[in-house]
């Protein structure tokens, strides 16, 4: 039951990201939002496989995890500038606690990379999604409106 709740949270996040982008004027905020949307898209690939809405493909799952790792490494770079926009959901705490924000991002990058090398079967994917979702939640709880 907890797992399906976690999956629901991931899909709610993905939906909110899509609607949040309309009307954003600041280019730095747009870059951040696009990076987050791409992360959500890759998480969705994994979630769809776990929910068996799409067939399991080990290579595609590994690729999605590798992309999540790469995007996590890029995350601090797109947040260096404290840009604002009425559509931004970034809390000011990001810049007050940039080292902690960066650490959470690097932790997710490492987790995603390790998981990418270990996913062989659909049974490997469920715990992988749980770990990824926990990493996303750790950052969003603290740094996202």
Locate predicted features.
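Sequence context surrounding c-type heme c attachment/ligation sites in exported
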Residues: 22, 26-145
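N-terminal signal peptide c-region/cleavage motif recognized by signal peptidases
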Residues: 15-20
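Bacterial N-terminal signal peptides that target proteins for export
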Residues: 1-7
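Short, linear, compositionally biased motifs with a strong N-terminal bias
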Residues: 10-13
